[in-house]
Structures are given as C-alpha cells and as structure tokens.
Amino acid sequence: MLKKKIGKIVTASAVTACVLVNATAAMLPSMSMVAFAGQELGQMDFNDGVGLPWHICESGPGKMKFNIDGGTYNIEIVEPGGAAKGGESRWDCQFRHRGLILEAGHTYEVKAEVTADHDGQIYTKIGDSGSPYREPWHNGYGGNEGNGWNCMQVTANKTLKIESTFTCTENIEVGEWAWQFGGAGQHQSTDCFPAGTKLKFDNMSLIDKTDDKTDYDVLHPKKDVPEGQVRVNQVGYFSTLQKQATAVVENGTAAQKFSLLDASGKEVYTGTSSATRYDEDSQQYIQVLDFSDFTTAGTYTISCGGKGSYSFKIGNDVYDGILTDAVNYFYQNRSGIDLEEKYITSTGMNESKADLVHVAGHVPDTAYIQSKWIKSYKADGSDVDKSSGTLNGQGGWYDAGDHGKYVVNGGISIWTLNNMYERVLDSDNNSKESKWADNSGTVVIPENGNKIPDILDETKVEMDWMMEMVVPSGYKMTYDASAYGGSDTGKYENMVFHKLHDHKWTGLGVRPNDYADEWGTIRIVKPPSTAATLNFVANAAQTARLWKDIDSTYADKLLKQAKLSYEAAKANPELYAPLDQAIGGGAYGDTNVKDDFYWAACELYATTKDSSYLTDMKGYADCFKVTTNLEGGENNGSFSSFNWGNTAGLGSLTMYLNRDILDAADAKTLSDSIKKAADTYIAKEEEQGYGIPYQGATFTDAINLGYDDSGKLIEVNGYEWGSNSFVVNNAIVMAYAYDITKDAKYIDGVSTAMDYVFGRNAMDFSYVTGYGTYHCENPHHRFWSHELDSTFPYAPSGVMSGGANSGIQDPYVRGMGYKLGTLAPQLCYIDSVEAWSVNEVTINWNSPFAWVVSFLEDEAPLVDRDTPATTAKTTEGGTTSTTTSTGTALYGDVDCNGKIEINDIVLLSRYVAQDATAKAPTAQGLINADCENNGSIDAGDITAIARYLAHLCEASELGPQ
C-alpha cells in the first residue's frame, strides 16, 4: 500500500498507463475533454466523472475520502493530520496533478476554483515534485512575491477563484500542481480545516502561452490498442492440451463459425462456437471457441464474427524463457546485495539489463526491536521503542512493492519454490532434477557454480534471513490479549519476530540504498507471533530435508532450530499478529494458527519421521485434506486451497510427496481429497466464461475500505486482492491431481488457468510483464517506477500482477471514476505503478506462477491422450492404483471377461481389502471398477456392482452418467 509524502521526485505519465483502452473501452469512463492549445493538464472540469491524473495523496495520519460527481472532484477531510497527531504538516492531505514540464522563459496562465463548506486555509503551488523544491508559482503569485509560505483564506460556501499568470525562470522537468490542506506543523500554525470539511475542485487549467510542445496530449499520446473481441492466451497453447478462446458477443447471438488463421492469414482450421451465455464475472455475453484438436505448431490468430484476436503460438515450447524470468524475480528483489547485470535475465521494456541494477540496500539492516504492537508511529519516529535493542535483519527478499520483509509471506514463498524442486524428486512425474542442477541456466544467480541446485541457493537467501528473526533470550514484550485475542506466557525465546519494515510509508520512485535520509524512515522489527514461528518451523524443516544430502551441517542447524521453535510455539499457541498493523508495511495479521501448527507438524514429520509429529498432525480437523474454502485471518470463504494466511494445504501437499511414510488409508484420504479439490476447480473453469478456476467472495477491509456512515464495515462482493494468486495456487492443486492420476483433464485445467493469466480474460490483457502482445507494464513497485520517474527502470519480464480486485482500494483506481460494486469483478484493474490495490506484485504470487510454468513445460509435451493412464502409488501399507482412460469401459467388469458377474465383486473386494494373495485387477479392470465415477476404488464400487446384480439398477447407471 502506498502513502506518499510531499516532495518526492516523480514524472507522472498518469493516465497513459492507467487507461486500458481495448475491447473493454466501452466499460471504462470516457476520458474525453475539451482541448486547449498549450494545456498542460490531463483533466480540467471532471464532467465525465474521471479525476485522473488529479488524485488525492495522504500521509498518515492524514486521511481523506473522495468522489467525482456533479462535475466536481469532491474531497472530505476525515483526519487532517499534522505534527501533533504524529504527522508532518499541511501536506498530510493533498490533491495534486503530476507529470508537468515547465520551461524557462515561458509564460503560463493558471485558473482554478475551489469551494469548502467550512472556513479554512489552503496552499497551492506549481513547481518541483521534490528537491530542490522550486516553486515558480504559488497561491496566485510568481515566486515568493507578496505571499511567502502562507496559505490563502477560504470562506465557507464561497468559491475561491484563481486567475493568474507567471513566467517560469528555470526549467522544471519533474513538476506538479499540488493543493495542501492538512494539519498544523512546519509552515502551518493551525489545521487548515477541521475534520469533516468537504472541498470541491473544478475548472482547473494550466496553459503554456508560449507554445504547445509540453501539452498533456503531446507528452501522453493515447495508446493505439487494436480492438478485438476474441480473447486468447497471448503467449500460446501447448499442442496436446485443451485450447479455448472466448469471444465477446451481443445477447442472442447464435452459435457461429470461427477460423484459425496462420501467420500469412490463411485459414487452417474452422470450428463452431458454443451457444451464447452470460458471464457474471465479466458481465459480458460470451461464446467459447474450442480448437483443442488442432495441434500443428505455429503462430496464429482467431477470427469470429468479424472480430479478431491477438496472435498466439501453438507448440510445446510456448513457455520458453518464462520460468527463468519468473524465478529471477527473487534475485532482483534480494535485500543487502548489489544487483549485477550479468545475473539479470531480461530487459523488460528497458533499453538494457543495466537499467535494472542498483546498489545494495539495507546493509546492514539494523532495526529496532519493538516490545509491543503499535499500529502507527509519529512521522519523525520519536515514539519508536529503542529500549529493546536492535536486530540486524540483513538479507532475504523484499516482499512486494515496498522494502518490508515478512516471515509469513516469506514462508509460503520458500515453501512453493522448495516444493517445486521437491516435486521433481518424485519418480512418478516427468520433471527432471537436472533442470534445477547447478549452472543449468534455469536460475541465474551469483551462487551458480557452487555444486548446489540453484533454486535451493535462492530459497536459502530467505531461509537465512528467517534465522536472523528468531527471538533471542531475554526479550520481553507486552501483549494486549484483550485487543488481539489469544494469550501470552511471557516466554519468547525461540519464537520468531513477525516482520521487519520502515516505521512509516515511503513513496514510489525510491532506491533501496538511498531513501532513508530523505524520507526520515526508521527500520523496526514487530513482536513475535505464533504464525511467524510456525512458518519458520515449516520452512526450516522442509529446507533441512532438501539439504541433508547436500550440506548436512546446515541441514542439522535448521532442523535443530525448527524443533526448538516448534516447542516455543506450542508454549505460546495464541500469540496472534493483529490484523491492523499496516502502516510502513503490510499487516499480515493472523488470528487463526491451527493450520500453521498442522503445516509445521507435516514438515517435521516428513523430515524426521518422528511419530509425535504425526500425532500432532492428526489433531487437526482437516488432516490429510486439501480444501477449497479458506476461512480465518484475512479470509472469509476464499475459493482456494491455501495462501499465506491459510497454510494447511501446504502441509497436505508435502505429505503427498512423502506419502511413503503414510499408511494406505491416510495416503488414500489425501489423494482422494486432492482429486476432489481439483475437480471442484475444473467444474468452476467450465462454468466460467473465461475459464478461470476462481470465484469471488464477500470480504471487508477495515484498513483500506473502512466503515460506512452507520459504523458498519463496508462489504465487497467480488474478486479479492491478488485474485491472480488464487488462480495459480488453485492450478497447483490441479497439477497434483494430474500427478496422481495422469488424467489429462487435470493438466488441461492447469493450462486453462494460465490462459486466464496470459490474456483470456475480460481485459484482453496478459498480467505478466514482457509476455503477450498486450501485457502488464507498470506493476506497483518502488524501484520499477519508470512510469513516474524516467530515471527508474520498468519492471523486468516474468512478473505477475495481482490483478483484478473488486475492492479497488487505492485512490488512483478510484480516480478513474470507479465506484464499489458498479464494475464487473474482472474489469476492476488498471495498469499503473500507483494502482497498488490491483497491480501489486509480491514474492508469494510470483512463486506459484513459477511453479505452474515449470510444471507445464515439463508435463505438457508428454501428455498422451490415446492410452489409459495408470499411476501406481506405493505406500507403507501397500499399493493403490488409479487409472483413467479415454477409451471404452464396461463398468463393473473388473476381471475384463466381457461380463458383469459375482466374480467381479470377489476380485474387487479382495483388492479393496488389500489381500496380498489375490491377483490385482489389470489397468483396464481398475477403470471398469470405478462404478461411482469418483476417481477412487472403494467399497462404494462394490455396492454399485451388487445393486446391478440384484437388478436394483441398470448397467447404464454404472460409471459416468
């Protein structure tokens, strides 16, 4: 989340990057306005309901609400801020337009109107966005002429009109027009306005009377994006997998022909669309176009009903390069090292890889250890607790767009990348260990050449940082159980601190090595939590398991600390991280840690085989299960199997990879649960117009959305923050189902999920930088801030945006005129670095993105749809087989003699009972045995055959219905 401060150098390209003008243009507010020669502003009268590039800017504790209605930009001051309340001054509440260029010797005409419903003061200035803070015009005067730093007086309900001219004496290349009306502080003896004041802005104008070379329309020409109504995976489709596109049509359109065209425009395939149906998540009428049976490699487009698509490829190499770029995200977000050009794998939209290098940040990363949870600190940091000493938290990964480092988010990210590697050690799939071998080229990092799998080198960076977050002896804290719930023992040694970040927010366009002095930030470590401790335990145990044959000393060190920290967590089972600690860093609150205990026990059991951990695992209600509904913490019925706040699914997937230490019944429960979850996601894909294995939820956001006028939390029904992360996490579950069954429907499900990410969505937009014709360019990131400041780089390729979010919490998105509940979930997106609620990137989103890409590039080329797929899974209690077929089955004919008879019941009964003296059914026999068509062979199938032999059902009622 972004809280910006007055005076940060930026060059806002504003609306250019934010307006996704394509096939959804009709869904977006119009940006049309009357143009004037020399007009420097991108918006003047707000008559079309759009505010951008004008936007509010808050610095805590300053807070505002706004809307764009009635032809004015309307702002309510909720809290003016100011030094006495922990802020700075009047710039705690601002309204501004950035991206201005002013030229020496040019004369400018300024006009504006502002009305307030209370008497007060306001300061307005045109000049530098940051140092050296030149102001060729403020408050109607050029320079400091006749005004100094004083404000203009505003009379309640009387419009203040400004009409002025000035001549600029110096070139200003990074300029802004800002209005300041916050609290008392430097240069401001009183609050500008009381809380509750409402202001209206209108008829803004800044005209260069000398020439029009820096007109807004000249500097920010509209992007000419081809309009198409056929949405495809813009990267491409694997030859042997399902291939579907979505056409946007009018209601009532009949099923119609579509054509696949090669690069020369020649028609090479035709098909017929599905019937027209309404897609709720896009609020569009759509037809699905299926061309799965076309397998010829090449580059193509689709034509349907006179509309076309972006180009895409078909082949088995369509994802080449993506994995390397996706995992390079982690190198480029390392803390505490100089980034070097030779380890950067892509240029993105930059001129060269050299644009992406920077000097090491936070060396050392000295942070003050906090003894209590404090929601916000004073801007000057005078109330930061320094009595508990410091911790050097150097290293690790920066979490997202900010410079914070968080144990719980690092936890799932380490697990996902480690799990991606551990999966290749399973001989039952087609992934090769050599892919991750040292110096293989998949992962490009400074550790190449040390004879250690490179992906493990990368996760070790974060694991080693976590080790630094372990609580030392003697630490004391004050925990407010009445406010946060849970309980406190007062003994914290071997617990783990929750997070490390700045004491307040910084702005965008900052380098990790040089912002602290300018922004006045202090690094802090928040108190320990049970959730952070258990994340550490799980990661340390998992990492120890993978390193034991590589570096036993390191593995032993991790495992020893994991055991100690696990016992510390059991002694503090309810030391919760509050949900509201979101100033200076993400909150990452968690008040339900039963799932974390289960995950930690799973990892410890998989590593040690100590039965005490198995006992702990079995105390969890959903032991050996993968669910599709996340509850607790920040989730309220999220349609997914795991995320950073709900980690039980991680433990279950770990146990699947280590199923040889489970008994047959537990192994079967686990595999059946994975398949059931995957089937749920496939069913959702088939229901959705764009094939997304996700659905929205009803959620609240006390921090960013707050409460309505009656004091009730504002509820949103739609896509959640980081919706794309749910898509790729759910794809991982389908991938495991494919590993279990080798049933192509599951890998089709994985591929279909990625189709959505790469462009088959309502935005007709690839959410991954550098991949797809029309792709993400400006994710929310402090260093990758070229959109705002041309001295900073664009993001590299291979970065996945969080995507559509019905909460649209940030003022930039709201500045488009979007209002809660009025826009289709899939359309709640803008590609801007300032749109932190919809365009954030983070380690726990890029890790599953990399996982899924890795899976598909290994497995997709080897899918065989012409033969039954049988996979034997060896367990401690025996062998179970799961077989699927695309051929013909006689359900009930277990012994494959062409008849259904009592012998089939006998054979199947002995198989289910694991009678080692009996001959097992053949692969086809197991297909025939699945009479309930649920992907498992059990007593229910025996009953089904018995019902048939007793003439209680027809043969046609066995198997698929």
Which role fits each region the language model picked out?
Residues 21, 28, 867-961:
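Cellulosome-associated attachment modules in secreted, modular CAZymes
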Residues 44-48, 95-122, 162-168, 203-204:
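Extra-cytoplasmic beta-strand recognition segments
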Residues 45-83:
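Extracellular glycan-recognition surfaces and repeat-rich motifs
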Residues 46, 124-126, 160-199, 203-204:
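Extracellular beta-strand ligand-recognition surfaces/modules
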Residues 53-58, 77-104, 121-150, 176, ...:
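Secreted extracellular polysaccharide-interacting domains
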Residues 133-174, 278, 284:
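Extracellular carbohydrate recognition and processing domains
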Residues 234-305, 333-411, 415, 419-420, ...:
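Aromatic (Trp/Tyr) and acidic
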Residues 317-340, 458-474, 559-577, 611-635, ...:
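Long, well-ordered core segments of solenoidal/helical folds
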